Amino acid sequence: MKRLSVLFALVASPALAASGPFFSLRNTDFIVTLAFLLFVGILVYFRVPQIVGGLLDKRAEGIRNDLAEARRLREEAQEIYASYERRQREVKSQADDIVANAKREAVAEAEKAKKALQLSIERRLKAAEEQIAGAEAEAVRAVRDRAIQTAIAAATEILGKQASPAERSAGIDKAIDEVAQRLN
């Protein structure tokens, strides 16, 4: 009510300063003041300020609810983001573990392959050495056989010229026995 009184006083002050009688229907300032007061009175009578205040209160409550919902959604989004970051760290850790395991397995497989290759090379070298030893023994045997044959031929020729048939036969038997003993 105090506000309304102050409003009337402020509205009436320019009208009082005008020339001529103020409370005349010919005075436009008076008519405007009356119309304004009538308008304000109608607004108050129909409780428009209360309705507008109620609408504003409802709107403010709606905004508060929207802000609360926004806060809740923000917190939920932060929780989801934090869980995704944790999951990403876990996945990165798992990926690092997988890479480390793969490297270890690759090194182990390389070592296995290296050992297998080394064993294969050793087997081949041993087989080659055995083959060389066999060829060497065969060559020694061949040389020995050739030397024996040459010695027999030379002995036969020498004995054939110097010895009688009975001596030759005894010499051949003796030589065969010697050769048999040496070969065994």
From Swiss-Prot:
The keyword Transport applies. GO terms for molecular function: proton-transporting ATP synthase activity, rotational mechanism; proton-transporting ATPase activity, rotational mechanism. It is found in: Cell inner membrane. One of its GO terms (cellular component) is plasma membrane. Belongs to the ATPase B chain family. HAMAP family: ATP_synth_b_bprime. This is ATP synthase subunit b.
